[in-house]
């Protein structure tokens, strides 16, 4: 999913008019755009697919291509834009994140399998959210950037589409 101010998400709506943006919490200053296959397909139809990224010697490619990265760079001009991804099943899985600021990649795509057991503040999603201005509200797992931003209330992109507040960009 993409995370950023409305201005950074607006270019995606120009490519895919059906793209939907949501606020996860009341008074949010950052918003999310769940990346569906339709959005990826439209972006890749307009600009080419590019290469799928494989990060950190992993055997798993990210749901991110070189085309996605170039477009995110352009979309972040004048603001910041993050890309975050989680893939968990039965409590185990991976998370990934990247950030662009003012058109430049400021946090390269990072993938972390749970087996690496890095402290929560150093995991890619929390690091990306922190770079976007989200501050953890306390200590412990339930008060990290992920929880503060409101992601803990949703188990999937489908939950966000069903339950979060849709906003106009």
Q: What residues fall within each predicted segment?
A:
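Short, extreme N-terminal segment that most often corresponds to the first beta-strand
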Residues: 1-25, 166-169
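Compositionally biased, intrinsically disordered low-complexity regions enriched in proline and serine
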Residues: 13, 23, 48, 147-150, ...
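Short, intrinsically disordered low-complexity segments
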Residues: 18-95, 99-101, 105-106, 111, ...
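Long, compositionally biased intrinsically disordered terminal regions
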Residues: 102, 106-169
